[in-house]
Design a protein with these regions (language model features):
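Membrane-water interface segments at the C-terminal ends of transmembrane alpha-helices
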Residues: 1-28, 40-155, 181-203, 208, ...
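Peri-membrane helix termini and adjoining interfacial loops of integral membrane proteins
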Residues: 22-34, 108-120, 209-217, 258-266, ...
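A short glycine-centered flexible hinge/capping loop motif at secondary-structure junctions
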Residues: 62, 168-170, 446-448
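Glycine-rich helix-loop "coupling/hinge" segments at transmembrane-helix boundaries
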Residues: 105, 203-227, 312-316, 481-510, ...
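Short glycine/proline-centered loop/turn elements that form peptide/ligand docking sites
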Residues: 157-160, 435-439
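Juxtamembrane inter-helical linkers in multi-pass membrane proteins
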Residues: 163, 171, 259-273, 309-322, ...
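The alpha-helix within a helix-turn-helix
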Residues: 165-166, 443
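Alpha-helical transmembrane segments of integral membrane proteins
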Residues: 250-285, 542-547
């Protein structure tokens, strides 16, 4: 336990303490001077306001898309309802920075839609200009977090409450506002909070759209331009962490004021079946809400197969050379991604299993600290972790290699492991929580040690949950850019996300960059499908059979 806590502190807390120390210490004493200097700079104040605005707008726009879709898929039955649920999750399988490239090609100043508008009506719309473009991409990428959590909350409500409200004359929007929304608020708040944190953490989308008046890009610019001695970069990192933790606190405080419990689900009724007109209206609503969110998948696919696509609504020449470039001439980006993400996933599965067991079955002190530290990376932006590692470990040489940790590819594996650890821990915790301890107690009564019981009994029963958590960790690592872009030692050691960033910096590289984006989508989609399938097969019924 002590060794594990020490390891987690070195990997998670120590880099964060280093960032905090530079931001609030001067000459060995605490000082507020760097923070005051931050708020005195107009550029930094604008970046802070833009970051808050982007987070709030992304949540608001995402809610306008997600909440109606959640109500539609949970409360009503119509042909193709399952397909709507699958389509609604598709934005999550495309990395946001890849979506930014695709949106720029479809909705940009010289994109497909604006060229058609210019040709037929003589006007263009600045969809992708400045902060507008960033918010548009982030809203249409992260809204499934709100959708999935809201749908889960609505699906768990007692329908008798709704029927009672209808019998008392409450219907339509009033029913939603007075009954459904308050009861589903915890689920909605979880999705909105996750969306807000992901938006302020997102570094790739603003960089792809060449917009730096946000906190995460400003931290990146300060570190890459002025180096690790620049105090402003660390102050920006502290502000980013404060925003994430502040959002968590506000959500918790807001939910603590209300009562959201329901007494069972005895009054549950099946979803309302829609007639022909209702079905047509439902699909029109789906097309209106989901259509824009699915544009990046089409755009990135066309761009990956285009040789010439400039100032025309569609590519004029198609080619397979872009895939030849990334698979034959520059295969290192994909190979590095598979190696780094696989190693990080294996490490996360091992750590997740041990941490979950200690939290649920352990009898040692400090378990609450173990839980807190292993969850912290969810609230820490990737650029902050990257800056912390550069500050904390750039002078430590890897035994046997002789090179500083931050000059090797190992730093990427470690940071990926840290960032994805909460997924593995939560996955292992959930499946272990479903396992009755009777089998473990029986094994110990027969003379097996706790360690042997864990390896021979507990671990096999946790396999599917661990694999699901490992797959989620693999996906998160494979498409990470926020921390990767600062930590890649050399181009030849760069993973897929870094390769995309390099390629799209030039017009001639957009095709290969899009081809790498398609590979990223395939990896994320395959991993998501496999994780979902494993999670469904590792439910309570399966556990009871094993017990």
């Amino acid at each position: 336990m002590a060794s594990l806590l020490l390891l987690l502190c070195a990997a998670i807390l120590y880099p964060l303490v280093q960032v905090l120390g530079v931001a609030v210490m001067e000459g060995g004493w605490p000082t507020a001077r760097p923070l005051l200097a931050f708020f005195a700079r107009p550029l930094f104040r604008e970046a802070l306001l833009n970051t808050l605005l982007a987070g709030v707008l992304a949540v608001a726009i995402g809610s306008l898309v997600a909440v109606p879709l959640a109500l539609l898929t949970v409360r009503y039955r119509f042909p193709g309802r399952a397909l709507v649920g699958a389509l609604a999750a598709l934005p999550l399988v495309i990395p946001p920075f890849v979506g930014a490239v695709a949106f720029q090609q479809v909705l940009g100043r010289s994109g497909t839609l604006n060229l058609l508008l210019l040709e037929h009506w003589g006007v263009t719309v600045p969809f992708m200009e400045g902060l507008t473009g960033v918010v548009l991409v982030q809203s249409l990428h992260y809204f499934p977090f709100i959708l999935l959590n809201t749908a889960a909350a609505l699906g768990g409500l007692d329908r008798s409450l709704e029927e009672a409200a209808r019998n008392l004359g409450c219907s339509g929007f009033r029913l939603f506002r007075r009954v459904l929304l308050p009861l589903a608020l915890p689920g909605y708040a979880a999705g909105a909070l996750l969306t807000f944190i992901r938006v302020i953490d997102d570094l790739g989308t603003p960089l792809m759209l060449n917009y730096t008046k946000l906190l995460a890009p400003q931290a990146y610019v300060r570190v890459t331009t002025f180096g690790l001695t620049d105090v402003d970069g660390y102050v920006i990192c502290v502000i980013l962490v404060a925003l994430s933790l502040g959002a968590l606190w506000l959500a918790k405080a807001g939910l603590a004021r209300g009562e959201f419990a329901v007494l069972g689900r005895n009054g549950e009724a099946p979803p309302m079946r829609l007639g022909r007109r209702g079905t047509v209206f439902a699909w029109l609503l789906v097309a209106l809400l989901l259509g824009p969110a699915l544009l990046p998948h089409l755009g990135i696919g066309l761009l990956s197969m285009s040789k010439v696509w400039s100032l025309t609504p569609l590519p004029t020449v198609y080619t397979a050379a872009n895939y030849e470039e990334i698979l034959v001439r520059s295969p290192q980006f994909i190979a590095n991604t598979l190696r780094y993400a696989l190693l990080a996933a294996i490490a996360d599965v091992a750590l997740g299993a041990v941490i979950a067991w200690l939290l649920l079955r352990g009898r040692v002190r400090g378990r609450q600290w173990l839980d807190t530290i292993s969850t912290i990376p969810l609230a820490i932006p990737g650029v902050v972790i990257a800056v912390g590692y550069l500050r904390a470990w750039s002078g430590w040489r890897v035994p046997g290699l002789g090179d500083p940790l931050t000059s090797t590819w190992l730093v990427l594996v470690i940071v990926y492991t840290v960032r994805a650890l909460p997924y593995a821990v939560r996955g292992a915790y959930a499946v272990l929580q479903q396992l009755a301890p009777a089998l473990e107690e029986a094994a110990q009564n027969l003379g097996a040690s706790r360690a042997r019981t864990f390896v021979r009994i507990t671990l096999p029963l946790m396999t599917r949950g661990l694999l699901a958590g490992g797959l989620l960790a693999f996906i998160a690592s494979a498409v990470d850019l926020s921390s990767t872009i600062l930590l890649v030692p050399r181009v030849e050691l760069g993973p897929l996300s870094y390769g995309i960033y390099l390629y799209v910096q030039s017009a001639v590289g957009r095709g290969p960059g899009a081809a790498l984006g398609v590979v990223a989508i395939v990896l994320a989609a395959a991993g998501t499908w496999a994780a979902t399938a494993l999670a469904r097969r590792s439910g309570p019924a399966r556990v009871r059979d094993s017990a």
